[in-house]
Amino acid sequence: MAQGNQQIDNQVLHHLRQKFPEVPEDVVCECVLQNKSDLAACCEYLTKVSPRFLYSEGSQSLTDLRNHMTQLNLGVSQNTHGAVQRDAVGMNGSRTLAPSVSDGPLNVPSALSEFYQPETPSVPTHTPASLSMESTRKPQPPQHLGLYQVGGKGHAPPQAPRFNPITVTLAPNTGRNTPTSLHIHGGPQSGLNSPNSIYIRPYVTQPGSTRQVQCRAQYSPTSQPAQQIYQITHPAAPQSSWSQHQTSHVYMPISSPTNTQAPSIPSAVASQAVSSSPLPSSGSSFSQYNIQNISTGPRKNQIEIKLESPQRGSGSSSLLRSSSAPRSACSSTSSSCPSSCTSLASSSGSSTPISIGGAGLSRSQPTVYISPSPPTAATAPSEDCALVPNTPRSQPKIYFSANTSADDGGGRNPPTVYISANPALQGPAGLRALGSQMSMGPAYIHHHPPKSRPSVGAGGTATSPRVVVTQPNTKYTFKITVSPNKPPSVSPGVVSPTFEPNNMLSLPADHHYAEPEISQPDPMRDKAVEPRRLSMGADDAAYTQALLVHQRARMERLWHELELKKRKLEKLKEEVNEMESDLTRRRLQRSNAFCQIPSIEEMQQLRCKNRLLQIDIDCLTKEIDLLQTRGPDFNPIAIHNFYDNLGFLGPVPPKPLKGPTKAEVSRTDAGVRVLSEPEEDDGVQWSCTACTFLNHPALNRCEECEFPRNF
């Protein structure tokens, strides 16, 4: 191979093969060589060419088909099939399944016969019973869901159709990460021959093979309106037989099938199926296989219903986990037409149901009835008694029927698919009432609580939920998992996660969980599932307890913060009240002050008083200054008037015109002499520091401004 070439980086090649398992190995090697081990360029190129291999578009060579992803082994070791080990891949609603989901290897067949598997026409095949999924608004050719059976009249042509098989192998002890359903994406619809229908027929390998039970599903675009009963029975084998691997084959066509009949089945399959048939005279044969994961090609207009038997007998709760060998399961997948609603059309005027169920077992097995009309109290009991024999425990049944009565209002309400776990209905009226509830809103699913009702033909009572499903919007994919005593796990989108009632945290918010009824446990069943259930319950309980502790601590912290915020709010309110009261008081004072404004006369009197007070203040100030300058000998009382010394010191007034007498002359001389004496005693004049006026040396204050001399 190309891995031996030294120019190829083995690490890059291994990474690309892990990321693009659907691309053949030689294409990956050529891409690595062309891009010189450039991981980004290789990823870009392989992303473009991946849809051609993934959806089987165009023509493929033998090498491409040989390297195509054909087998998915979930939990099966490599030496079980003796095939080449590859990376663990799966399809779970997307292109591949993560390695953490599926730990088993991917086995690639070495021969091209794995793809076509030609079958001999030695065993005649009867005309298949078909169930038409047709539109009520657009007159398009119907596309059917048929269930092939073995042991009828007529022969099928030996020509094998062009199918691309995908094998799903489930180990007995699969992990909890194993996917519960396998979605295979088909190409876009291409008109009338688009593969929108799937046919299921049994296929059992040789007794010496490692795989015990298988089923095949193939698409067919034609209608085969025949009235036959098809029942799937589980082998009443010992407990050791459950250790074998359970395999489901899902065929995805490369193009529209050219063969409209069901391919024949090997003689070993027919002989083993006929030998296990409890009703050989009815013209229908029974085969032994267990359907686990079946999906149609297109993602749109798909309704998948998966049923599982109860964990502990009839009426008890069953965990919807990944597939395990001790638990039997039936899966019915239907693909509707590309219209705004889904209907199950009646087939050729007969209401014989197509049953998929278990018979001859000591424990309860689910039974599926696909009927073109709702079961009634008159017809359901006889059919149930004929199809399913009485068992020690009740067998829950689920009906798929279409509300196609003429009195339903015609086009007022869209057709409704009614799924019920009990055939005891109140006639078509009850179905019409449920259908009227579901006629509103696109993709609306309504769940009714389970009610205890007698199970017809089972010899006991069964409590199971019933679901009314409408699909007016064709853009979504619905996966509905129904189990006795369990509400269905409904998920719009690609695939629904595993529904486990023990893990209450994974339930939706609006999910109403029904309490399981107490019944006698099955010792052989408990041995296989008890350790896993106990470990899962312990993990879920520990996780729940830790989550509760975390939420309580968070609640206490938030409560404490809330108390602090409340206290701060109260304090702020008190401060605001104080400030508002202070503002009100100030406003009142201001208003009162305006009322107390004095009059003009009062203002004049106050001004006079202020003037007198100012004079008194000045006098006292001058006296204090003189006392400080004159010293302790200064006596202000001896000065009658402080301003007397500040008289007129100008020139002497002129003498009178009369001649003076001697006395006057002598008095005048004496006065002149007196006046001249102080002039002789005068010193240097001093200048005032305030007004720079030259004052007499005898003055202690300025004559102009009365400023002190020594200040």
Swiss-Prot record:
Pfam families: CUE (PF02845). Residues 262-287, 312-353 have a biased composition (Low complexity). One of its GO terms (biological process) is positive regulation of canonical NF-kappaB signal transduction. SMART domains: CUE, ZnF_RBZ. InterPro entries: CUE, TAB2/3_CUE, Znf_RanBP2, Znf_RanBP2_sf. A zinc finger (RanBP2-type) spans 681-711. Its main location: membrane. PROSITE patterns: CUE, ZF_RANBP2_1, ZF_RANBP2_2. Residues 119-134, 252-261, 288-299 have a biased composition (Polar residues). Residues 118-142, 252-414 are annotated as: Disordered. It is found in: Membrane; Cytoplasm, Cytosol. Keywords: Coiled coil, Cytoplasm, Membrane, Metal-binding, Zinc, Zinc-finger. Signal peptide: none annotated. Residues 8-51 form the CUE domain. It is a peripheral membrane protein. One of its GO terms (cellular component) is cytosol. GO terms for molecular function: K63-linked polyubiquitin modification-dependent protein binding; ubiquitin binding; zinc ion binding. Residues 550-630 form a coiled coil. The RanBP2-type zinc finger (NZF) mediates binding to two consecutive 'Lys-63'-linked ubiquitins. Adapter required to activate the JNK and NF-kappa-B signaling pathways through the specific recognition of 'Lys-63'-linked polyubiquitin chains by its RanBP2-type zinc finger (NZF). Acts as an adapter linking MAP3K7/TAK1 and TRAF6 to 'Lys-63'-linked polyubiquitin chains. This is TGF-beta-activated kinase 1 and MAP3K7-binding protein 2. The lineage of its organism: Eukaryota, Metazoa, Chordata, Craniata, Vertebrata.
